[in-house]
Every structure is written in structure tokens, then in C-alpha cells.
Amino acid sequence: MLAFLVTAAAAQGSEAQFNQRQAKALNTFAKKAFSKGFPRIAKIVWLKTIKLYDSDNKVAWTSLGYVKNGNSWVIDPKRPYPTKDTGKGSDGKPLESKYRALEKTLANNHRNAAKKYAKADRQDLALKHWQMVLRWVKNDSEAAAALEHKEIGGLTGTDLEKTLYDRSKMIEKAIEVQSKTDYETETVTGIECPPLDRAQIPYITVTSEHFTLHGAPDQEENLHKSLKWAERTLVVCKAAFPWSYRDSKWPTQWACVANKDLFKQTLKANDVPDLEWKMENTTGSVIGSTKVTTTPGVQTMYDSCVRNVAQGYSGFGSAGYREGIGHTFVGQMFQNNRLFAVDRKKQEGTSASEEDLEFKSPDFDVWKTLSLEMAWKSTGGVHANEIPFCEASNFTNEERIKAWSFTDYVMRRDPEMLRTMDRIAQDMKKRRAKQPLEFEKQFNEKHSDVTIPQLEKEWEDFWTEASPVLKAIRKNTPPVSAISKGVDKWLIAFNKERKKYNRATVTWSANFSTRCKDHALYLKNNKKERGPAAEHTQKVDLGGSYATSLFAHMAVVQTGAKVGKAKKVFQNWVNLPGYRDMFINHTILTIGMFVEDDILVINATSGIGPPKDKGAGFDCFPPRNDTNLIFDRQVPVALLGPEAEKLLADNGRAGNKVIGFPLTMHFGSSGGIPFRGNLRCQVTDKDGNAVEGVLVYDDGEIRTTTAPGMAAFWPLDPLPKGKVQFIWSWSKDGNAGSSKGAFSAK
């Protein structure tokens, strides 16, 4: 017995020394990344030090801006951790090479330790080290053999990983197939919408096989598209959930109103409970058998319909799991989330660090980064046993991210577990019993083979990509590999162009550049995919992905890009309203950018937030007042793409090669245009004659003609030469406003 204790103590001491060496290696790299100006990359590495090797590592904790208080580490308010990347693009490749070398070194150390412990007949420690080998390298035959892994998608892994992989791929495939599947929808009469009738709001009704949707007459096309997405989601739900749905009309109807004023009008007319609170804090409410939602943009309308189907099909009733499953499906379908149980502005104050702003981003990749950092943290955060007790009226940012990411994980594992959790949560809420340990106990009685703490550990492993299979499911491009040479020079030129329009400078983020790299490489590998339509999508059969295709819709792309001609490139973008938005939009604070040879890709949608300029809000272009600016009177349709072609065709000008120079209003919001339905634009020539045109909202899918939160007035013909006058007008909360200006067309 004494010999065993001595051996165990020796092993423990050896493990401690081993962990210290691994921690030191990670800390060295983190310091290098930090000193080079990449604090977010360094942060993840220091969190790995703490999580994987030394929970009390002084170097890592203090570097992250913490101070020791007794036995705990707490944030030091005197040393806030920086979040903005300031490094040079030329440092990217060397830094990535160092990290790849570090991964190999860490894996080799674990491999040697595993072999040593196997010879010493310490299989417990040997298996632990073999598992860690696979955390650091893509594949290892010795580790796979020792762990008795099975073949999974060209890799090896455990039975659980096979379940996660197979279900994830099944859901991804269902979404990809459904995204291309059409469904019949029709505009009908004779179906009433009592909530809108009481509010005296005009509407039309669109139906599909299973769903009924009411909305504004001028949004007929969007209503049809939204119901098609609802039908697609129903098919995906049938694949994702093991329980069935009675194939009949949905029990509730849906109604979409274009702005918050109309939503308030509807709530008042229907005398809903908690009226004042709902008007101030929510964007959706169930009134009778109708779900009414504020949808100022088509993407928000899609979000609403997909969320309604996912939440209804799941049957979840508790706030945490209901919100979680809604975010899960919307995120997987669109890579964005725009609707929440409660308006986030009521929860977040005015903090404006990059991390705080990320909680406001609809970008699903940003959410994944937040979940990743949450999973790496060894203390604090929201625990899985707290999700059942989340309150819809007071969802914190951290609760929302954890509810979504945990629900997303467990849905991949076994949705029946989610249904059990939700039922227990609803029962405990009825009994007003807020007891996390009791929740865990009841769950374990239903699922004896797994515990909530075990699921939480699995959630951590999934989001931190603890094995090659989990990495293959996540398919993430690490930020350290998204730093491209020359990006800092492009950023300088970009900010010079913004300064020309009196806009604040923006910062660059490696985190926001990962999808930029993915799309740049896709375009590099597919040189025939050129032009506005092809450059703003990806084809799976050409090596693209459904998720990155969605990113490409709103990415800014320039092929044949040379940094020496950056000024000219940016000046030409004034003719492309979606690209123009980057220079006029006050809410763009941080961008992603990647350069691959002569291909430039910019992400201008992830890093949005409150404007740096005090008093800055929405604004028009050309600018208000008469600034004596001169613009081309027309834009070639070939530069704009199919959305401009369709606009001309819909207005009796099919085949025209040019369209008038567009006027734009930039709201900078990601969830649509708040004045939708209440916004007008009038354009006249020097003699006061009206210029015929069409006002278009942010409903498109090609960045050349569309940007989130941007409205565009398209003159259908080339503008008349000479002075052109315009007036934008709107109303909100019963108050009217306007912006007037003039410019010259040549």
C-alpha cells in the first residue's frame, strides 16, 4: 500500500511539472501575440493555459487583467484588458507558423507522456495524455489506437463524437437542400387578422400548406418568401427532432408590422396585459391566436417565421430553452439572429468595448466567438443548471449566449434530453422552486447515463474543439490564420476615405476576418466566379459552404485589388450603394479584412455599435444641404448585378444597361430600417421636375446594391444633367422629420 501511495505521489508531482512546462510554452506564445498587437488571440491562449494546465497560473491571470483576492482571481478595474487588434498584417504568417509549431510541441509532449505512463501501467494517465494529443493535432494514429477510436468522416473519434458528427451533418445537409427547395404560397382573401383589424392597420394575407402570415400590402413579395422559409424550417425540424408533428395547419397565425410605431398601435388597440412594459421592451406579442412581430426588414421577417416554427415544433415552454432553440435554428439557417425576447438596449447600458459590442451583433460567427470564450473560462459565467431558471423579462447577454450554445449542443447530441430539461423547468417554475441541484437530480432520474455536469463538460469540449472530429464539425478558421499581409495598409486607406466624409476611423479585427479569408480563398480557387452575383455567394459543388455563402451576400469584394490603387478603388465604390455604406455608416466601428493575392474581402457587418461621434445618427448620401458635389448621372448595371436588372425590368425598362445614380439613407442598424413604411424620397431636377424612381429597402442579397439598414432611391433613368435636388422625409412617434440637399449630375 505504501509503495502504491509513493508511486501515485510521484505521478502527481510529475504531472504538475509537466503542466507547468506546457503552461509556460502557451504563455510565451500569448505574450508574443499580445506584444505584436493581437490581444484577442492572446486572450484565448491564456485562457487555455488556465483551463488545461494550471488553474492558478499567475502569469496568465495577471496578463488577462486579474488580481488575486484571497483564493480567487478578480478583475482589476485599474488594468482593463485591451480588445482591439493593432498589429501589422506582415506579422500574421510568422505568428501563425509559431502557433502551428507550438501545437506540434504540445502534442509531442503529451505523446511522450502517454507512452511513459503506458509503460508504467498507469493507463488512466496514459489515456488522458492521448486525449490531449488529439486536442492539439488534427490526427494521430497512435492516439486513435490507444483510445479505440472509430472512423468518422475521414477522422477517428468516440461513439459520442460519431453521434455529434452524424447529426450535425444531417442537419446541415437538410438546411442546404431546403434552402434550394421551393414551396407554393399564395395571396388570399377572406382570412381575418383580428389584432390588426382592431388596430386599423391595412394588411394582406399569404398562406402556404401549413402557415398563415399577415403583413403590409407593399411587402407581398417578402411575405411569400418568409412563408417559404417557414415551410423549409418545418422539414428541417422533422429531421432534427425525434418526435413528429401532426401534419396540419399551424395552430397560430402570424402578423408582421413594419415598425415599432405600428406594433405599439397594435398593442394599444388590443388592450394587452402589461401594456406599458411590452411597448417599451418587446418587439413581439401573442394576441389571441396570432403572433404579432415587428419586422422592419425582410431578414427580420425570415427570422420571425423560422423562430416561430422551431419554437412551436419543439414544444419548449420555459424561457431559456425556448429562446435557445429559436436562436439555434435561426442561426443555422441564416448565420444571424435579429429577434430577442426582450429588447437588448434595455439590458446593456452604454459600454462600447469590442467585446460588449459583440453582444449586440446579429452575426452568428460573433456569437460563436463569445461562446468559445465562455467555454474556455474556468470560473464565473452561466452554468447549465441555471438555464431552466432564466426569465424572459430579464435575459442577460451571458444567459442568452449560454442558453443558445448549450441548446445547440444538446440538440446535436439528443433532443429528447432538451425536452426533459424543459419539462422539468416548467414544472419547477409552476412550483416556484429555483433549485439547480434539484433540477440536476430530476434530469438524472430520467437519463441515468448522463448528468448535467457531464453535459456541461461536453459543451465545453464541443465549443473549444477538443478533438479532430469536433474541429471538423465546427469548421472554424482560427483568427491567427486570418491576418494577411498588407491589411494594415488597406485599413489606412479605408479610414482616409471615411475621414473624407467626416466619419470616425474604424479598427480592424482578426476575429472578424476569418470568414473574409474563407471567401477570399474560395474566389482564388474559382477564378471564373466573377461579377456581382458570383462574388457574393458560394457554390457547394465548387468547394464553398452554405454558411460562408450567407456571409458572402453582405461581404464587400474587390478583385484585381492593388493597395497602391486603394484610393481609386474606394472612390469608385461611391457608385455602388451597398459598398458606399461603409464610408457613410456611423455605426461601423470595427471591420474584418483579408487580402489574398489581388482579392480583397471586407466584413463590415460584425463590428457595429453606437457611433463614436456624439450626436451622429442616420444620415443620407449625397449629404444634406448643397455641398456642390458632382457625381456621374448613371451607373452601369453590370457593376451592380441582378438586383438592379430586376428593378429595371419590374418598372418597364428590361434590358437597360444603365440606371440613375442612387441616393441613399444610412441607418446603420442590422435589424432592418426603423422608418420602414414611413420613409419617402423626392428627387427633382433644376427646374423642379420630378425624377421617376423607386425607394428600395435592405431586402436584397447582393452587397453592391444592398446594405443592412440602408434605404436606396433608384432613379430609373440617368439623372438629368446639372443641379439635382432631393428631400428625404419620415415620421416616427407622430413627429415628422426631413433631410434636404442638392448636388450636380454630369
Predicted stretch roles:
Residues 25-29, 91-96, 202-224, 474-481, ...:
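Acidic/histidine-rich, surface-exposed loop or edge segments in extracytoplasmic proteins
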Residues 41, 238-254, 314-322, 337-344, ...:
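Surface-exposed patches in mature extracellular/periplasmic domains of secreted proteins
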Residues 56-112, 119, 125-206, 456-484, ...:
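Pro/Ala/Gly-rich low-complexity, hydrophilic intrinsically disordered segments
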Residues 201-322, 326, 335-336, 397, ...:
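Juxtacatalytic substrate-recognition/specificity segment
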Residues 268-288, 316-475:
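Acidic/His/Gly-enriched intrinsically disordered linker/tail segments
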Residues 474-685, 725-728:
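Functional surface patches built around histidine and acidic residues
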Residues 669-671, 731-746:
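Extended, polar beta-sheet/loop recognition surfaces of beta-rich domains
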Residues 716-722:
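Surface-exposed, short loops/turns at beta-strand junctions within beta-sandwich domains
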